[in-house]
């Protein structure tokens, strides 16, 4: 069924760039001067340079002993038309030791008109003539997608998934409870969320997914969103060749085996040498490399060791026929000098797209990490492997890598690991790279001789590999400092115009002082939280830092709360650390509520005092108080990590009887002095794995009726409000743009 998507009619303002094409055709009478020509015949080549654009230097091949070379080589530059762009042309002579400059010339690009194409002669040393063909055109098809709407692939997925879910819900609920499902318009959008929490979150989420799969709930979900540790399980599951034909049960058996080994086994000298040498290839190609790259390799070797070449794009085959929920992953873009609690841009990843909803900018997954300028790729690299993204999504653990491996001599002294993570800020992992220089491993300017080039590159590689090896296999500064550990990629928004930016809910009024003040009356009272969330990123910085989203709050609600996704029911699983098993479990959920309110996104009121009234439970349900008024507000079923009924029951309604059955379930999660479920435990013996896995498997199955009842209510809500999260086109026309002045924090 076709429908009108109002978000397609919101214009995301962006400036078009120019593509300047230069064809180096030929030169005649190339000379080194009378005396120079007597000693040697020139070996000419041409360098082109425009300082105002990335990937600014280009060069032709050289010809040996040729004074009339014909190159006929084409080069492209992406330019900002508002800059003073000047082409510098240098005629060079290739030599064995150091190349020689034979002459230079300049050409102002502004002298050309858009659509113009012409040949331009340049004279060097009053003798040599070089002919360049130049053309200038508008880049009308950028590589970034500028839109507030979901991409067409996700829209197609949603429609196919609704068809599948309609039948699955009828099967799950039975004919009586599903009688409101007349068409796909009545199908509610269900999302499953997993929090961060290291391997604890990953193992717990594995039990959750097994229960959801076997109960049929997973077949009724449209999305599954993860953060940090949960993304590691999602990556393991979705990259597995047998999923979704086979369920999580067999895959979880493999996972249990993989995480039972000591992580130090990944750091044998031979393996480390292989890691570092593979990263040299990335660095030498011009991409930034940080410790997060290495951490991603270690996570990949642990969890997806037989599929290290997998990419995010390759997961599309799992969801193209809408056979399973669309996986959504996340990280943060942060600034070096600002706390991530004050400023952070949420970056979302799916097999279809990567981007930032705040700016309405998205790209195909294989372009993430490539060099962009004004929305156009100026240098494309191979798609980053999935394990690199796994390192980025869980990069908080690369900060305290010595604690993860247990190589620190002080690991049992002073603060606990959870307390250390609590105190980490983006400043600990983001180096303030003021130079912002490119990372290409380049030799001296003009070096062309192959032997000299190989020797230069070999020396560079040997030095870099040696430093990394020494850092990893010894208790060096790399283990004792936290600087520069964030993931780093080329800034895909470099050169864009951010005079206009967009709230996540673009159709809501951001200019009301009263409404803003009302939102500050939230359960989490720290006034600094999210204070600068409306600020734009730095479009002049060549690279951006991407870190673990758990450093701001530990639940991936921003992915699911995008109104374009129209989610009716959210089933969230929180594996976050708590001071003790009896501590209130709502800290992260309250932060998510505050973030949602400050972004004017509908969110049910979270009452933290329900813990005082009802005590610790396996899950809590939060609904809109007035569904008739709060038509766009989702219902949330919030599962927490708690061992309550599992101690008595081995399955829902089936009591434990034997001593062994009771002992295996008699354990604490956060109060155990041995800390087997610590956030920083990266080795799970089989018993610890089974305990945590089976606990969350039980807790989920024990509350399946709660989930089913919420689905039935969501069907009714959807039936009563078929145009949920939609707006009239007249409203869209009236609100095409939101200027930054309306998005800045109101002053009192």
From Swiss-Prot:
Pathway given in the UniProt record: Membrane lipid metabolism; glycerophospholipid metabolism; Lipid metabolism; arachidonate metabolism; Lipid metabolism; prostaglandin biosynthesis; Lipid metabolism; leukotriene B4 biosynthesis
Residue span, C2 domain: 6-122
Record note on disruption phenotype: Mutant female mice have reduced fertility and produce small litters that most commonly result in dead pups. The pregnancy failure is likely due to a deficient implantation and parturition. In an inflammatory setting, mutant mice are protected against various pathological changes. In a bleomycin-induced model of pulmonary fibrosis, mutant mice show an attenuated lung inflammation characterized by impaired induction of eicosanoid synthesis and impaired inflammatory leukocyte migration to the lung.
Positions of region (Disordered): 427-458
Binding site for Ca(2+) 1: 40-41, 43, 65
GO terms classed as biological process: arachidonate metabolic process; arachidonate secretion; cellular response to antibiotic; establishment of localization in cell; glycerol metabolic process; icosanoid biosynthetic process; leukotriene biosynthetic process; monoacylglycerol biosynthetic process
Placement of covalent cross-link Glycyl lysine isopeptide (Lys-Gly) (interchain with G-Cter in SUMO2): 540, 605
Activity regulation annotation text: Activated by cytosolic calcium, which is necessary for binding to membrane lipids. Activated by phosphorylation in response to mitogenic stimuli. Stimulated by agonists such as ATP and thrombin.
Binding site for Ca(2+) 2: 40, 43, 93-95
PROSITE patterns: C2 (PS50004), PLA2C (PS51210)
Enzyme active site: 228 (nucleophile), 548 (proton acceptor)
Processing after translation: Phosphorylated at both Ser-505 and Ser-726 in response to mitogenic stimuli.
Organ and tissue specificity: Expressed in various organs including uterus, kidney, spleen, liver, heart, lung and brain (at protein level).
Assembly mode: Interacts with KAT5.
Primary role: Has primarily calcium-dependent phospholipase and lysophospholipase activities, with a major role in membrane lipid remodeling and biosynthesis of lipid mediators of the inflammatory response. Plays an important role in embryo implantation and parturition through its ability to trigger prostanoid production. Preferentially hydrolyzes the ester bond of the fatty acyl group attached at sn-2 position of phospholipids (phospholipase A2 activity).
Protein name as catalogued: Cytosolic phospholipase A2
């Amino acid at each position: 069924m076709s429908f009108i998507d109002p978000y397609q009619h919101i214009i995301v303002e962006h400036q078009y760039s120019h593509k300047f094409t230069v064809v180096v055709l030929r030169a005649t009478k190339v000379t080194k001067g009378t005396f120079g020509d007597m000693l040697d015949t020139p070996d000419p080549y041409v360098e082109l340079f425009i300082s105002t654009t990335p990937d600014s230097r280009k060069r032709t091949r050289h010809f040996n002993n040729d004074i009339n070379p014909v190159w006929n080589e084409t080069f492209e530059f992406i330019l900002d038309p508002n800059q003073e762009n000047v082409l510098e042309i240098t005629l060079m002579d290739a030599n064995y030791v150091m190349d020689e400059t034979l002459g230079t010339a300049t050409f102002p690009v502004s002298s050309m008109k858009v659509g113009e194409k012409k040949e331009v002669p340049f004279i060097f040393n009053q003798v040599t003539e070089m002919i360049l063909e130049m053309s200038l055109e508008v880049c009308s098809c950028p590589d970034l997608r500028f839109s507030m709407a979901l991409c067409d692939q996700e829209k197609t997925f949603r429609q196919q998934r609704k068809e599948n879910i309609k039948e699955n819900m009828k099967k799950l609920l039975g004919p009586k409870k599903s009688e409101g499902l007349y068409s796909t318009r009545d199908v509610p959008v269900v999302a499953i969320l997993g929090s961060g929490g290291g391997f604890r979150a990953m193992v717990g989420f594995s039990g959750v997914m097994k229960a959801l799969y076997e109960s049929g709930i997973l077949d009724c979900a449209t999305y599954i969103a993860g953060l940090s540790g949960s993304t590691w399980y999602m990556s393991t599951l979705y990259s597995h060749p047998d999923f979704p034909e086979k369920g999580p049960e067999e895959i979880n058996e493999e996972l249990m085996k993989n995480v039972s080994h000591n992580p130090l086994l990944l750091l044998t000298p031979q393996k480390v040498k292989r890691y570092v040498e593979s990263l040299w290839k990335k660095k030498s190609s011009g991409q930034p490399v940080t410790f997060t790259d290495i951490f991603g390799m270690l996570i990949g070797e642990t969890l997806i060791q037989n599929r290290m070449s997998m990419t995010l794009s390759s997961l599309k085959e799992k969801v193209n026929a809408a056979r399973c929920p669309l996986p959504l992953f996340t990280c943060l873009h942060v600034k070096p000098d600002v706390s991530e609690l004050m400023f952070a841009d949420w970056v979302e990843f799916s097999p279809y797209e990567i981007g930032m909803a705040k700016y309405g900018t998205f790209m195909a997954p294989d372009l993430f990490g490539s060099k962009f300028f004004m929305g156009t790729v100026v240098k494309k690299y191979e798609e980053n492997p999935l394990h690199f993204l796994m390192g980025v999504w869980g990069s908080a653990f690369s900060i305290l890598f010595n604690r993860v491996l247990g190589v620190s001599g002080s690991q049992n002294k002073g603060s606990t690991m959870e307390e250390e993570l609590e105190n980490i800020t983006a400043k600990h992992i983001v180096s303030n790279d003021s130079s912002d220089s490119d990372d290409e491993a380049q030799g001296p300017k003009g070096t062309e001789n192959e032997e000299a080039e190989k020797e230069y590159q070999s020396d560079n590689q040997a030095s870099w590999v040696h430093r990394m090896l020494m850092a990893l296999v010894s208790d060096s500064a790399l283990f004792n400092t936290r600087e520069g550990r964030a993931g780093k990629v080329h800034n895909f928004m470099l050169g864009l115009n951010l005079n206009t930016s967009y709230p996540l809910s673009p159709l809501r009024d951001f200019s009301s002082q009263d409404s803003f003040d009302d939102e500050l009356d939230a359960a989490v009272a720290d006034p600094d939280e999210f204070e600068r969330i409306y600020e734009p990123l730095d479009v002049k910085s060549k690279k951006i830092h991407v870190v673990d989203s758990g450093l701001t709050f530990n639940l991936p609600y921003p992915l699911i709360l995008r109104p374009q996704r129209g989610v009716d029911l959210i089933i969230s699983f929180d594996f976050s650390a708590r001071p003790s098993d009896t501590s209130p479990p709502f800290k992260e959920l309250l932060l998510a509520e505050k973030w949602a309110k400050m972004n004017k996104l509908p969110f049910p009121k979270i009452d933290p005092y329900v813990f005082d009234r009802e005590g610790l439970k396996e899950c809590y349900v939060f609904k809109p108080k007035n569904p008739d008024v709060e038509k766009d507000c989702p219902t949330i079923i919030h599962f927490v990590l708690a061992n309550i009924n599992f101690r008595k029951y081995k399955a829902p309604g089936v009591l434990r009887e034997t001593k062994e059955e009771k002992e295996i379930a008699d354990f604490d999660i956060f109060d155990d002095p041995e800390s087997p479920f610590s956030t920083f435990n990266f080795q799970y013996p089989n018993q610890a794995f089974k305990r945590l896995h089976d606990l969350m498997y039980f807790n989920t199955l024990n509350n399946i009726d709660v989930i089913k009842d919420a689905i039935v209510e969501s069907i009714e809500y959807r039936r009563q409000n078929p145009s949920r999260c939609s707006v009239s086109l007249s409203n869209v026309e009236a609100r095409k743009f939101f200027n930054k002045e309306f998005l800045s924090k109101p002053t009192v």
